[in-house]
Swiss-Prot record:
Protein name, as recorded: 2-dehydropantoate 2-reductase
Enzymatic reactions: (R)-pantoate + NADP(+) = 2-dehydropantoate + NADPH + H(+)
Subunit description: Monomer.
Organism the protein comes from: Salmonella typhimurium (strain LT2 / SGSC1412 / ATCC 700720)
Result for mutant: residue 121 to T: In strain: DM4593
UniProt gene name: panE
Active site residues per record: 176
PANTHER family: 2-DEHYDROPANTOATE 2-REDUCTASE (PTHR43765:SF2), 2-DEHYDROPANTOATE 2-REDUCTASE-RELATED (PTHR43765)
CC per GO annotation: cytoplasm
Record-linked InterPro entries: 6-PGluconate_DH-like_C_sf, 6PGD_dom2, ApbA, Ketopantoate_reductase, KPA_reductase, KPR_N, NAD(P)-bd_dom_sf
Binding site for substrate: 98, 180, 184, 194, 244
GO molecular function: 2-dehydropantoate 2-reductase activity; NADP binding
SUPFAM superfamilies: 6-phosphogluconate dehydrogenase C-terminal domain-like, NAD(P)-binding Rossmann-fold domains
Pfam families in UniProt: ApbA, ApbA_C
Length: 303
């Protein structure tokens, strides 16, 4: 399959290496155009992938059968709009990033839009990407007009398992958002690995209560207890991990808070719900972000 991967960070390189190893015809796409992108990845089994792959080839993009987007949430809309005019209108665009809200910014895109969540963990160590832990990718149609592309889940399952197709992906997206609303801001503010959050049960409870209320109003059945149990499972299974938001804060980069807690706040306002704990955390992360961005050190990384 001919696939363009938009974004060559940790997640992008994970997909590029996996797709390449399984015989797919792939290219990367970088914000600053370059003819090649370097993919250096150590997999969970210790194997090493080191290749220079084609990048930013518009002819390749014009024949691509899938655009896989692995950018940070705040980078997605502008980049996808730029590439959509060259991508065939029948080729689906799959967005995999933390948070929600990018689809609302891309309603007029002609191509089929899919969205997903991923629990694989990968991190950068110098110029090398380390695939820390295997996980699951959940994908599904982003809008009502986007059809059944479950065959893609079958193809991607053979590349980087596990991959699951959902006809209603939004329920899964909300579940992942609940986890992100807990883990990302708390670890970023406490400067700690995920496992340390076991000591902050009161804050976790407060966040889960508020998120559950919003999810119920969105039309998906859940409870604070269900969310809390799921969040605690994720904290335990990723105890040693450094969250993406904490990585961003440590590197003085723009975070995805606007698409995680920020999205929750927007939906809460629509439903007339007060979410004071999430509001407090949102303001604290934005304050931290503005401190280093104001000093000029928070330079956005290339895709």
């Amino acid at each position: 399959m001919k696939i363009t991967v938009l974004g060559c960070g940790a997640l992008g390189q994970l997909w590029l290496s996996a797709l390449c190893k399984h015989g797919h015809d792939v290219q990367g796409w970088l914000r600053v155009p370059q003819p090649y992108c370097s993919v250096n990845l150590i997999d969970t089994d210790g194997s090493f992938f080191n290749e220079s792959l084609t990048a930013n080839d518009p002819d390749f993009l014009a024949k691509s059968e899938l655009l896989l987007v692995t950018l940070k949430a705040w980078q997605v809309s502008d980049a996808v709009r730029t590439l959509a005019s060259t991508l065939p209108v029948t080729s689906p665009i799959l967005l995999i990033h933390n948070g929600m809200g990018t689809i609302e910014e891309l309603q007029n895109i002609q191509q089929p839009m899919l969205m997903g969540t991923i629990t694989h963990a990968a991190r950068r160590d110098g110029n090398i990407i380390i695939h820390v832990a295997n996980g699951t990718t959940h994908i599904g149609p982003a809008r009502e007009q986007d059809g059944d592309y479950s065959y893609l889940a079958d193809i991607l399952q053979g590349v980087l398992p596990d991959v699951a197709w959902h006809n209603n992906i939004r329920a899964e997206m909300w579940r992942k958002l609940a986890v992100n609303c807990v883990i990302n801001p708390l670890t970023a503010l406490w400067n700690c690995p995920n496992g340390e959050l076991r000591h902050h049960t009161d804050e976790i409870n407060a966040i889960c209560e508020e998120v559950a209320a919003v999810i119920e109003r969105e039309g998906y059945h859940t409870s604070a207890d269900d969310l809390r149990y799921y969040v605690e499972q994720v904290i335990d299974s990723t105890a040693e991990n450094i969250s993406s938001m904490l990585q961003d804060v440590r590197a003085m980069r723009h975070t995805e808070i606007d698409y995680i807690t920020g999205y929750l706040l927007k939906r809460a306002r629509v439903h007339g719900l007060a979410v004071p704990e999430n509001s407090r955390l949102f303001e604290m992360v934005k304050r931290k972000e503005s401190e280093y961005e104001r000093s000029g050190t928070g330079m956005p990384r290339p895709w």
